Amino acid sequence: MKATIQRVTSVFGVPRASVFVPRISTPFILHNYISNGRMDLFSKEFHNGRVSKSDLWSSNKEEELLVSQRKKRPISPHLTVYEPEMSWYLSSLHRISGVLLALGFYAFTITLGVTTIMGMDTTFQDLNKWYHEKMPKWSQWVAKGSAAYLFAFHFGNGIRHLIWDMGYELTNRGVIKTGSIVLAGTLVLGTYLLAQ
């Protein structure tokens, strides 16, 4: 049985530290020879002098080179290596719109529930009256516009996801096309809801 040292390189051609690789055939023997990428110091061949200590690990220079190269590499996956795409923004906006719509829904229903439990008997008509009489006009437009456009976008992008689930428009061109349709539909439906 002959032990050899092989230079292992990464996919990108960056040299790695030399690693002890014995030429053996069974996994059991392999376990006796390798421990964490190094020669097992307790193996019989090591103590019988068949493998020299220099075969265990290469010089410290290679290890230092490896450490310095790793420090310079970006953490993977790193956003700076990718070009921004429409799908990123629409995916993020879909999640954000869902969270904001849910928060508005929960605030509304919790308000109705808590006031009913406290004996105030608040109804939808009471909240609607408060909205129109107590809230400033600009605040009404902001609330209604936010709800209208967020709902329109979330609704349209949900349909887009259903189309993808059926296996359609999964190419880059299809993703951009459906994203553009969703944005145009958001403008139309959101403006319609805001005008109501």
UniProtKB/Swiss-Prot annotation:
Known Gene3D superfamilies for this protein?
Answer: Fumarate reductase/succinate dehydrogenase, transmembrane subunit
Where located? Mitochondrion inner membrane
- Matching CDD domains, A to Z? SQR_TypeC_SdhC (cd03499)
Disruption outcome: Does not affect SDH or TIM22 complex formation.
A biological process from GO: mitochondrial electron transport, succinate to ubiquinone
List, alphabetically, the InterPro entries matched: SQR/QFR_C/D, Succ_DH_cyt_bsu_CS, Succ_DH_cytb556, SuccDH_FuR_B_TM-su
Annotated binding of heme, by residue:
H154
Coiled-coil zones:
none
User: Which residue intervals are topologically Mitochondrial intermembrane?
Assistant: 119-137, 196
Q: Where is the transit peptide?
A: 1-53
GO CC terms in record: mitochondrial inner membrane; mitochondrion; respiratory chain complex II (succinate dehydrogenase)
- Membrane-crossing ranges are 98-118, 138-160, 175-195
Mitochondrial matrix face residues: 54-97, 161-174
Top-rank lineage group of the source organism:
Eukaryota
Family to which this protein belongs: Belongs to the cytochrome b560 family.
> What NCBIfam families is this protein classified in?
succ_dehyd_cytB (TIGR02970)
| Function according to Swiss-Prot or TrEMBL | Homolog of SDH3, but seems not to be a stoichiometric subunit of either the succinate dehydrogenase (SDH) complex or the mitochondrial inner membrane translocase TIM22 complex.
From the Swiss-Prot or TrEMBL record, give the protein name.
Mitochondrial inner membrane protein SHH3
